[in-house]
Amino acid sequence: MRRIPGPAWVIVAVLVVWLVAGCENLRLVQTAEEAKDFHPKSIGVLPADAGIYKDAEGKIDGIITDVLVRTKWFQTVVGGEDIRKQIEANPELKKSVDVYLAKLRELNFSDPELCKVISELCGIEAILIPTVDVWEYTMLGGDKIARVGISMKLVDTKTGKTIWRAGHLVSEEYRFLKPELTSMGRSMVRKMIDRMPH
């Protein structure tokens, strides 16, 4: 029997690791048929709905904005913090965003008229709507766990159509040193944005 040389084992090991890492899928990805013709030049990130996870507020907005800017896919990226300031300064925008999100959350209806108002007031062609599903340190069966879960929807402001949505959850077990939730979130956002139409 012929023996396989050491360097060949290294190459095989690297390929296996690369294939396994590349196969990590997101928990949820849905892309509309219209995505193939959707190429916005500008995108706005609505402030993330962090729900009970107040520690994630602001952090996730900054992470998403930074990842979008680094892709260089868009001429303009209006981040969650910038849109939050615009909402505070403009009552019409505040009302439009509040009503739009309420309809989206309660009726699963993306109102095209409100999308157009938000688009005009913010100067954007697409809206990214992030939600923090989980952002915590917890105990499960006696194990210490760090968990981060994020969902996103990409909406075409011309039609109000949800072009893409994705969601993912990662957990990391630890003993002494807590993993940084922000680092876990950044890694997850990169994976999600990589799958987003642009």
PLM-predicted stretches and their roles:
Residues T131-E136:
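Generic short beta-strand segments
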Residues L15, I124-I129:
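Glycine-rich, often proline-containing surface loops adjacent to acidic residues and nearby aromatics
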Residues V10, G51-D55, R175, P179, ...:
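Charge-dense, low-complexity intrinsically disordered segments
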Residues V10-A21:
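Bacterial N-terminal signal peptides
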Residues C23-G44, N108-S110, L114-A126, Y137-H198:
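C-terminal/domain-edge helix-coil "capping" segments
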Residues P47, I52-G123:
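N-terminal segment of the mature soluble domain
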Residues M1-I11:
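Bacterial N-terminal signal peptides that target proteins for export
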